[in-house]
Amino acid sequence: MEKGMNVLHDFGIQSTHYLQVNYQDSQDWFILVSVIADLRNAFYVLFPIWFHLREAVGIKLLWVAVIGDWLNLVFKWILFGQRPYWWVMDTDYYSNASVPLIKQFPVTCETGPGSPSGHAMGTAGVYYVMVTSTLSMFRGKKKPTYRFRCLNVILWLGFWAVQLNVCLSRIYLAAHFPHQVVAGVLSGIAVAETFRHIQSIYNASLKKYFFITFFLLSFAIGFYLLLKGLGVDLLWTLEKARRWCERPEWVHIDTTPFASLLKNVGTLFGLGLALNSSMYRESCKGTLSKWFPFRLSCIVVSLILLHLFDSLKPPSQIELIFYVLSFCKSAAVPLASVSLIPYCLARVLGQPDKKSL
């Protein structure tokens, strides 16, 4: 088993080396792709846009992003995936040969296990939701037209172009091996496809959101404690990241498994609070919500305020405080974009004339 994995990892190292040597001019592009593919953009950019354009799509997008990333965490704890940037330095596979030179970048040194790729899984799930939802909106109940078929081809070509760029980016940056990004894409699509058949998320009560959040958090912590009790160190990757990362400042605590867990459950709990609040019912369920200028205003204000909010980084000196603040910050994102911002704008704009609806 280990010998087979070493061969697979060596193929990944050679792939990374090939990309870094032959596509040096694309370095900035691959870094940009990796930054854009971060799941944070699904929460801070894509969610407020889709929620105020098509509420059901926004809700499904957030559920897919959260549950997909939670499953990604569990998979990583089970699979114990290596990362190229530390494996190439840590392995004795190259004992009788020269070690391939692998460059590191500011976004390379993530601290969690590597399989499956979180960037690939998150992007695949979120973009799958957007593509399938867009196609369902334009198709209607009639027989597909020529224009619809063209749109179908264009959107799916765009989808796979995005996935290819994300996968190549993660390999180029030495953050993942090829088999890890492929596993991420397939897993993300599977999660998104599953949520196409789940209707209960659109009218879930606050109690249901609370219990699901509690289950996700307690299961992950319980699973961690169980494996730890069996002698398995699930934070083994943190030591490797700190040891083999080229620069200490490139190792960020917000990429640890528990940071990801708290962000996800915080986001889902915040969505539950927002959708079951009186501010949401007054602003997003009345006649004003049908007025396009109002919805557009909600999108613009949400994007601006969430961008400013995202720039506020919780202090990371004390891990417990960092995790608690990460949970609160994540919960505030859907709470602001779903209820607080629309409520305030509704008070400012007032009720529109019926002719303008």
UniProtKB/Swiss-Prot annotation:
Listed EC numbers: 3.1.3.9
Entry annotated with the keyword S-adenosyl-L-methionine: no
Protein's UniProt keywords contain Transmembrane: yes
Cellular component, GO annotation: endoplasmic reticulum membrane; membrane
InterPro entries: Glucose-6-phosphatase, P_Acid_Pase_2/haloperoxi_sf, P_Acid_Pase_2/haloperoxidase
One record GO biological process: multicellular organism growth
Gene3D superfamilies given in the database record: Phosphatidic acid phosphatase type 2/haloperoxidase
UniProt keyword terms in alphabetical order: Endoplasmic reticulum, Gluconeogenesis, Glycoprotein, Hydrolase, Membrane, Transmembrane, Transmembrane helix
Known glycosylation sites: N96
Main location, first listed in the record: endoplasmic reticulum
EC top class, as a word: hydrolase
GO molecular function: glucose-6-phosphatase activity; phosphate ion binding; phosphotransferase activity, alcohol group as acceptor
Parts of the chain that traverse the membrane: 29-49, 61-81, 118-138, 148-168, 171-191, 210-230, 255-275, 292-312, 321-341
SUPFAM superfamilies, per the entry: Acid phosphatase/Vanadium-dependent haloperoxidase
Record topological domains on the Cytoplasmic side: 50-60, 139-147, 192-209, 276-291, 342-357
Residue ranges annotated as Lumenal topological domain: 1-28, 82-117, 169-170, 231-254, 313-320
One Pfam family, short name: PAP2
Record pathway: Carbohydrate biosynthesis; gluconeogenesis
Cellular compartment(s): Endoplasmic reticulum membrane
Active-site residue numbers: H119 (proton donor), H176 (nucleophile)
Protein's membrane topology: Multi-pass membrane protein
Annotated motif Prevents secretion from ER, positions: 354-357
Residues that coordinate or bind substrate: R83, R170
Family: Belongs to the glucose-6-phosphatase family.
UniProt function note: Hydrolyzes glucose-6-phosphate to glucose in the endoplasmic reticulum. Forms with the glucose-6-phosphate transporter (SLC37A4/G6PT) the complex responsible for glucose production in the terminal step of glycogenolysis and gluconeogenesis. Hence, it is the key enzyme in homeostatic regulation of blood glucose levels.
Protein name, entry field: Glucose-6-phosphatase catalytic subunit 1
